[in-house]
A protein has these predicted regions:
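Short, small-residue-biased leader/transition segments that mark boundaries at the very start
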Residues: 1-2
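Beta-strand signatures of extracellular beta-sandwich domains
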Residues: 59-63
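Aromatic sugar-binding surface patches on proteins
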Residues: 79-115
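Surface-exposed, short loops/turns at beta-strand junctions within beta-sandwich domains
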Residues: 115-122
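Edge beta-strands of extracellular beta-sandwich domains
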Residues: 134-143
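Short, compositionally biased P/S/T/A/G/V-rich stretches that sit at domain boundaries
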Residues: 5, 10-45
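Short edge beta-strand/loop segments characteristic of extracellular beta-sandwich folds
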Residues: 45-54
């Protein structure tokens, strides 16, 4: 998936700012990984939330099985977790020729960790809000 940052400018200010994945709708702003899908072993007991254009001005909240929304604390932001799909593509069985400039970043600020309160959770919904009034939601089911 190729993504580009899109800026909407009005006068001398940014009116909106988001990522746009090639062949994906503008609303596609995050991907949720289920238990066991993290690249790092220590995070495989929970969910990994990849919020593509996250910035410190965003709010990230989770809702487990339709309970109340909970804002994720700042320590849930992972600084050294790779995106699983990028990792598998670059280092998996069908990996392309080694190109250091094209490999997934191991140091990023848009991956979050959330461990559901209940081991028998059914659905976790993530809501990410940016300062431009955009609210993005995505859900994952426990299968």
């Amino acid at each position: 998936v190729y993504k580009r940052q899109v800026y909407e400018i009005e006068g001398n200010r940014i009116r909106n700012w988001y990522y746009k994945g090639t062949a994906f709708p503008r609303e596609y702003q995050m991907y949720l990984y289920g238990p066991g899908e993290a690249v790092s072993e220590k995070y495989r007991d929970g969910l990994i939330l990849n919020i593509f254009n996250w910035h410190t001005t965003w709010t990230v909240e989770v809702q487990e099985d339709n309970a109340g929304w909970v804002t994720l604390p700042s320590d849930s932001n992972l600084r050294y977790e790779m995106d699983r799909r990028a990792y598998d593509f670059m280092f998996g069985d069908t990996k392309p020729e080694h190109r250091p400039t094209a490999e997934p970043e191991s140091n990023n600020d848009h991956m979050f960790y959330y461990k559901p309160a209940s081991e028998s959770w059914g659905t976790v919904t993530v809501r990410a809000s940016d300062p431009y009034g955009n609210v993005y939601t995505e859900s994952i089911r426990n299968e």
